[in-house]
Amino acid sequence: MKFIFFDLDGTLLPMVQDDFVRCYYKLLTTKMSKFGVEPKKLIDALNYGAYQMTNNDGTMTNEERFWICYEKIMGISKDTYINELNEFYETEFNEAIVSTKPDPLARKIIDVLHDKGYQVVLATSPLFPQSAIYNRIRWAGLTPEDFVLITTYEKYHYCKPNLGYYQEILDNLNIKQEGYLMIGNDIGEDLSSKLAGFRTYLVTDYIENRANMSYKPDMKGSLQDLYEYLKQL
C-alpha cells in the first residue's frame, strides 16, 4: 500500500500558529471563567500540559500526561469540569476557525491522492483530544474519513519532534519505513521525520521555525506547488 503523511495546522489548515492559540485560549478562558476558573491559572495548566506532552516518554498516553499536569497546576480533579471542557471542544472551539485561513486546495490535494490510490495519514502532533482535531479537520474542508489514521492525544504516547511519535504511527499502521513522504510546515516538528527515514516536503506558506533552525527538506514549495507536484506522482 502507498502512504503519504500530512501535518494539519499550517499545512492542510493554513494558519499562523500564534494567532490560533491566542484565539483558542480566549474562547476557552471566557467559557471557563463563568464557572469561576481563573484564566491565568487555566492557561498555565494548558501550557504546562503541552510542554510535558511534547516531552512525553512513552510511559503513558498524552491524555494521561496532560491531566496529571492539569491537576497539579489547577489544584482540582480533572472531573470537576470535564463535562464543560468536553462541551467546549464540541461547540465554542469551532469559533476559532476565524484565526485560520482554510484553502480549497486542501480538498483538491486529498482527492488527487485518493484517486491515485494513496492512503493518507494525518500526522498532527497529538496535543488535543479527538473532538478538537476532528473539528479542525472539518475547518480545512476535509473529513476524518479522508484519513486512514489520525493521531490524537487519547491514543499516542509521544509528540513531534520525538522520533518515537513517527515510529508509533508506523507500528499502528503495521508497516515498515520505506521512505514515506511527510508533508508539513514546521521546521522543528515535521522535518525531524527525516531522522526517522521519511522524505520531507516543506510547505512554505506558513513556515514555523521557532528555534530558528537550519533546514534542508527534500522538497519545498507553496500549497499550490505541492498540489502540482502530487498530481504528477
Q: Model features per residue range: what roles?
A:
Residues 96-100, 129, 157:
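Short, flexible loop segments at the rims of nucleotide/cofactor-binding pockets, characterized by
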Residues 61, 80-83, 90-121:
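Short, acidic loop-to-helix structural element flanking the phosphoryl-transfer center
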Residues 12-14, 52-53, 124-128, 155-156:
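Short histidine/acidic/glycine/proline-rich micro-motifs that form metal-
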Residues 1-4, 111-112, 125-127, 133-233:
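Asp-based, Mg2+/Mn2+-dependent phosphohydrolase catalytic module
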